Amino acid sequence: MAKRLPGNRLRPHVKAHKTSALARLQHDAGHQGFTCATSREVLGLAKAGLGDDLLLANETVDVSRLAAMAATNARVTVAVDSDATIDAAAEAGIRECVIDIRVGFRCGCEVDEAAQLADRARASNIEVRGVMGYEGHAMGVVDLDRRRELVKAAMERLVEAHSLVGGELITGGGTGTHAINTWVNEIQAGSYVLMDTAYTEQTDQPFSQGLFLQSTVVSVAEKFAVCDAGLKAQGMDHGNPSWGDGEILFCSDEHTNLVPDNSVKVGDRISLTPAHIDPTMAKHQVLHLVSKGEVIDRWDIDLRHW
């Protein structure tokens, strides 16, 4: 990705991996700014010395958390889309924001509200760095032509809002639209670094699967087997995980039932591929780095929680 979107053209979203060690590799590859979903991610990156330019791409009215972010040595920018979010940011001592524009079905203000909100922020001594809009409704669309249509419609709204607000940033996008969203000047992709089955269904994606969930076969029946990783071990909002050596039947709280292509026995270790990495990472404490079947390092997933 560093070759596709060098430097500040990419603002990696750490909500995907929640790991400061991995963020450091992204930083070393030339990406000085990061997108964050939670105050914990902002504070964790600041503590790790990766606070060159942190964008909290979510609205919050929690003044105490905003104040904690403002008190770090990091450069912190927050997304705002209402008088209430601007007032909370001002009370907490936040000094920079972007106006979040509703370009789909997420947060954001209407285009015709953007200028008024920018004026309110500036009157509160908050610099408006530009606009943000996340076309999440387009991100997972498999058909490329349809994805292009959705991105175009969404980004036309964002560009119009930017003409009213000003600032150097037009920020948005993600892994699913990183190659086709030519309207923004920085892309907030996150999943690309580990990938999941939801994105690998898009045949135009150049990224390889990097995250696997290790599980153990704990029971074997005549026509199926059961492993010990279920709903509580992985993100399920995008469907079942996949398994390269058989078929997934269903997942329950602590187990996944599967039909193996070849016989398995109790105690066998298997690798599941999660359908959605973000919530999967939030459920675990450690990433094990594996090369040629050997664990070569362990990274704490230290940016979890709120």
What residues fall within each predicted segment?
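Active-site-proximal beta-alpha core segment in soluble small-molecule metabolic enzymes
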Residues: L10-G133, A138-G140
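Active-site loop/helix belt of alpha/beta enzymes
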Residues: I94-E96, R102-Q205
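C-terminal accessory subdomain/extension
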Residues: V220-W306
